[in-house]
Amino acid sequence: MEDVKELIVRLAAENALKYGKADTKAVIGKILYMRPDLKQNVRELIPLVEEAVRAVNEMPKEALEGIVGEVKKEKKEEVRKWPDLPKAERGKVVTRVAPEPNGYPTLGHAKGLLVPFIYARLYDGKFLLRFEDTNPRVERLEYYEAIRNEFSRLLEACEEELGLSPGRWDEEIIESYHLEEMYSLAKKLIEAGKAYVCTCPAAEVRKRRKLGISCDHRDQPIEKNLELWEKMLNGGFREGEAHLRLKTDMSHPNVTMRDPGIFRVIEAEHPIHGDKYRVYPVYDFSVSVMDSLTGVTHAFRSKEFEPHVDVQRHIVRALGLREYEMIQFGRITVEGIPLSKRYIRPLVESGILEGWDDPRIPTLRGLFRRGINPRAIVRFFYELGPSKVDATVNMEAIASINRKILDPIAERYMFVPNPIKAKIEGLTPPVIAQVEVHPDSKRKREIRLDESEVFIASSDLEGLKPGDELRLRGLVNVTIRSVNPDEVSLRVSEEQRVKGVKIIQWAPVRNGVPARLFVPESPYSFRMLGGYGEPALRGIKEGEIVQFVRVGFARLDRRDPLTFILSHD
């Protein structure tokens, strides 16, 4: 038991450092998540945890940091089984996540965040958050903030779950503040004869690139290209009338390498700069330049961008910039649910989804609203690893991890969906029922029953007949007398045995709490189950996650009307 005591003290210290004071319930939940084999000894654990919590709450911060440092070291060793990075030197690795603020981040963005973050921390390096905001037509200020909020929650969870600290980015960069610098680099390419302004229609450009045929603009004098470039910058061209192209090789086997466009005119207000700029770099130019200029040593991206690696390396070399490692990882898809914002946005705009935080979709805020703990997402992607193989995710895999996190800490409540009234013959009110707050706790919650009738779920009567026996949780055994469409007649059983009797949840009729349970099914459908719960439902805080007995884990979404969202069973 000595190693368990040591673990309890470490977890209590970690909790105290994070929240200012250690909490017994939180520490118990964490240790049961890490050591599920200890569930059977929970009664012995509780006094040990209470003692540890009292002790660490009296310790100075320096002592707590010493204890927690050991915990993080152990967790960090666990993560080291990830493959080594090529050409990586400890203390000098710089990685980044580079989201475009054009929507709310999804589960797919979580992988793009966590893979480079984990590697940066494993190598005691630096991690950057860089907003790729050079397409103003689809970018909004609200998306910058959403990305900051959701990414912050995941990185904090990464520190808690994997011991990788600090659980935040080291520097934030906004690409659009570097546009003038990128204009100078573009001019440098033109002056070196490595780029030219093309005014061919977009369809003609696509056709010629496919066939490997250059256009007349390719051989324009440098002076002409500089003149046209200034005209682009000064508003002389409308959107689509001109773009700056990189001069490469029109016969290159990779079509992406055939004189790609690197700057274009976009006539849209930028969320930060308004109408100050109208010429913006394409992704290949901005990502290659910014990765080099900001010191990135290892740039991770989804392997869908692999055909663009040649272009990006060419840009870096043409400008004489510092080169870096480009590493691809596999994409993820979610079984039966679209991840792409181009699929989700129309569903939001049409009203099919109530917003980007709709619990039916795998946006990060949708998952959090559904009751998925950020630690579950971190653990899932850690187990998945940085593989280059594409993966199809079944949400049950994440639910399984989430269940292990919630089960030790979520209090149990009774909720009766689709209720039917049941009268109990032989029950003399008032009666005080005692129900478990949690299977691993001695605590009980009292429910006062002032009448001889309760609500039970209509589904619990399926297949039953008069004479069959049930047990109302924490109350009494009953025998079915009769079943009608709108009412059931029960009587108190002569024998009050527990074993071998089906135990069901119930709610008082007089003081039961009306509640709704939102059950996500697909991006296009859901079920809203109405019902009644025990009186204690009134005390649940908004955002709190509980377990409805025999129903599943649920998060309180709003208080008026009392509405829960089903996380999973």
UniProtKB/Swiss-Prot annotation:
Gene Ontology process terms (BP): glutamyl-tRNA aminoacylation
E.C. code: 6.1.1.17
Keywords of this entry: Aminoacyl-tRNA synthetase, ATP-binding, Cytoplasm, Ligase, Nucleotide-binding, Protein biosynthesis
GO CC, one annotated term: protein-containing complex
InterPro entries linked to this entry: aa-tRNA-synth_I_CS, Gln/Glu-tRNA_Ligase, Glu-tRNA-synth_arc/euk, Glu/Gln-tRNA-synth, Glu/Gln-tRNA-synth_Ib_cat-dom, Glu/Gln-tRNA-synth_Ib_codon-bd, Rbsml_bL25/Gln-tRNA_synth_N, Ribosomal_bL25/Gln-tRNA_synth
Reaction(s) catalysed by this chain's protein: tRNA(Glu) + L-glutamate + ATP = L-glutamyl-tRNA(Glu) + AMP + diphosphate
Family according to the record: Belongs to the class-I aminoacyl-tRNA synthetase family. Glutamate--tRNA ligase type 2 subfamily.
NCBIfam families: gltX_arch (TIGR00463), PRK04156.1 (NF003169)
Function description: Catalyzes the attachment of glutamate to tRNA(Glu) in a two-step reaction: glutamate is first activated by ATP to form Glu-AMP and then transferred to the acceptor end of tRNA(Glu).
HAMAP family: Glu_tRNA_synth_type2
Listed name of the protein: Glutamate--tRNA ligase
Native source species: Korarchaeum cryptofilum (strain OPF8)
Gene (name only): gltX
